[in-house]
Regions:
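A short, terminal or domain-edge coil/loop segment
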Residues: 171-176, 202-204, 235-236
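Alpha-helix C-cap/termination motif
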Residues: 138-141, 198, 244
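Extended, well-folded catalytic/binding cores that form a central cleft or groove in large enzyme
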Residues: 172-175, 189, 216-220
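Single conserved hydrophobic/aromatic residue that forms the stacking wall/gate
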Residues: 240-249
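Terminal amphipathic helices with adjacent charged low-complexity linkers/tails
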Residues: 206-239
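Thiamine diphosphate
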Residues: 1-182, 208-211, 224-225
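Internal alpha/beta core interface subdomains
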Residues: 182-216
Length: 249
């Protein structure tokens, strides 16, 4: 049989997509998002930061199985202090993201910051506009950051209406990333966290069903090094520094 010819010992373990540092691995779009979270924790550890991660959102196609992949990868997430907290709705998840950016300001904190990933389908972006806009006005932590992951069903294959989330993100003053390949879900996600930390903004990222539900063999890239111009913390700094929203002017 084919399995006898190859030999079980020659087959890589299923979780190599999360543990392998280099080489070629197979993963789906939702698994790439899990890998991205683990790589962010690895980036922070390499930089000497003791960060935590937080994932929260509400399931819906094309991100309907993202929570399943997070539960399956639970031991890997736990090993990197990444918590998964499914929300009652997308609004609550966005509010959780705002609170997580205050972590290092708490006297009892044990982390240097918390990076947060929100997820939801297009209508979730629509209904959460108030929470997203207010969270973005509060800002992000320099050692945390917020990435808002929207799953868009352009063809209305499994939704009541078609949706395109860029407009909702732009309306809330979020920059938007639009990865086109499985490996870009990882690289764009890491860039999004770096951008959020530097700019003080929450960062939107979208994916269509044809990508997030697909799978591919990809070559794992080395962890990136992002060049950041010096940031001077002033009274007008855009990062989260106080318990009240920054002046939108």
């Amino acid at each position: 049989t084919p399995s006898d010819a190859v030999g079980e010992s020659a087959l890589p373990p299923l979780d190599s997509r999360y543990t392998q540092a280099s080489g070629r691995v197979f993963m789906t779009g939702t698994q790439a998002l899990v890998r991205m979270l683990l790589d962010q924790a690895r980036l922070d550890a390499a930089a000497g930061l003791a960060t935590g991660g937080l994932v929260s959102g509400y399931r819906g196609s094309p991100l309907a199985t993202f929570d399943v992949e997070l539960w399956r990868a639970n031991r890997h997430l736990d090993g990197h202090k990444i918590d998964f907290l499914p929300a009652v709705n997308e609004d609550m998840a966005a509010t959780i993201m705002a609170g997580a950016q205050q972590a290092e300001q708490q006297p009892s904190t044990t982390v240097d910051g918390v990076f947060g990933l929100w997820y939801g389908k297009g209508p979730g972006v629509d209904r959460s506009g108030d929470a997203i806009k207010h969270g973005n006005m509060y800002g992000s932590s320099p050692n945390g950051g917020v990435l808002m992951m929207a799953g868009d069903d352009h063809g209305c294959v499994s939704s009541t209406i078609s949706h395109q989330s860029e407009y909702g993100f732009i309306g809330a003053s979020l920059p938007v990333l639009n990865p086109a390949t499985i490996d870009e879900l990882i690289s764009f996600g890491l860039f999004g966290f770096a951008l959020s930390r530097y700019s003080g903004l929450w960062v939107g990222m979208k994916s269509i069903a044809e990508l997030i539900e697909a799978g591919a063999s990809i070559d794992l890239a080395p962890l990136p090094a992002f060049a950041r111009p010096p940031l001077v913390n002033t009274a007008d700094c855009l990062l989260y520094t106080s318990p009240s929203p920054r002046d939108p002017k």
